[in-house]
């Protein structure tokens, strides 16, 4: 079974093994995660080649040892927040590989999670799947994704989603400042400085701290709402840039997942059958 997380800039995909009854093996999460930038000129060719190459060992193994087929080996579960045109290109590649595409959609309740949104369609499927992944870890979780946007969601130990926040990523904040105020567009800076002595560092450090401040404020509100501190679960491409600082400032358990959406997608696939 293939799992595909199609985001605003990249496709992340992985395979998960199953048993002949069609469910993922106990405790099995995504396998090796492969990331492809979908604005790359070779994206379509690379994806098709990857899918074709992966299919050959499975066919050879079944022919060699007579092992029973995995009933879900030809399934491809797709979670997409990308533009429609990009999604259609991915679906075309999956279809060419003989895979059955199944789409993940936000549900009001799924796998022990009850979302706060009255209209499930309003909650991005990536955030929804992140909640499913967090639920599997147990306890209260503040789920933060540092991707094209910064999203924060609070999930309590009973599986209730308390809602969330959406903010601007540091890279987009820097870009917006440079476009609105050309004098601030002086190139890349060092986000690690405490107080900058030049414009590039000042912009880089401030935009980094804006995203950090969003999470710190959300943490305070989460503690007040729950009456206890939650664990913090980070995902997204920039998660590692914030993990150490958050662990130090919050004195809390901070975990980083490089496959947060894919892990939630695997749990969604099992729940939906």
Segments predicted by a language model, with ranges:
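Short glycine-aspartate micro-motif
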Residues: 1-5, 77, 141-145, 233
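A polyampholytic, Gly/Pro-enriched intrinsically disordered region
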Residues: 120-130, 185-195, 273
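Glycine-rich phosphate-binding/hydrolytic loop that grips phosphoryl groups
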Residues: 254-273
């Amino acid at each position: 079974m293939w799992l595909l997380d199609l985001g605003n800039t990249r496709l992340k995909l992985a395979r998960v093994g199953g048993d002949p009854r069609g469910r993922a093996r106990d405790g099995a999460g995504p396998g090796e995660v492969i990331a492809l930038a979908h604005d790359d000129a070779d994206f379509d060719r690379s994806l098709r080649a990857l899918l074709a190459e992966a299919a050959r060992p499975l066919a050879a193994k079944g022919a060699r040892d007579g092992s029973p087929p995995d009933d879900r080996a030809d399934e491809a579960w797709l979670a997409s927040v990308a533009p429609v045109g990009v999604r259609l290109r991915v679906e075309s590649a999956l279809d060419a590989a003989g895979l059955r595409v199944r789409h993940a959609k936000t549900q009001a309740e799924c796998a022990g999670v009850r979302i706060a949104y009255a209209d499930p369609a309003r909650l991005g499927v990536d955030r929804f799947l992140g909640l499913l992944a967090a639920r599997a870890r147990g306890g209260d979780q503040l789920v933060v994704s540092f991707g094209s946007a910064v999203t924060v969601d609070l999930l309590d130990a009973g599986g209730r989603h308390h809602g969330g926040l959406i903010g601007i990523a540091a890279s987009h904040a820097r870009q917006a400042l440079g476009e609105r105020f050309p004098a601030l567009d002086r190139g890349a800076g060092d986000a690690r400085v405490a107080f900058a002595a030049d414009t590039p560092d000042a912009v880089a450090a401030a935009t980094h701290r804006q995203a950090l401040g969003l999470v710190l404020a959300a943490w305070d509100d989460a503690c007040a709402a729950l009456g206890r501190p939650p664990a913090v679960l980070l995902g997204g491409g920039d998660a590692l840039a914030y993990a150490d600082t958050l662990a130090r400032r919050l004195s809390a358990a901070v975990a980083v997942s490089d496959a947060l959406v894919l892990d939630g997608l695997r749990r969604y696939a099992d729940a939906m059958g």
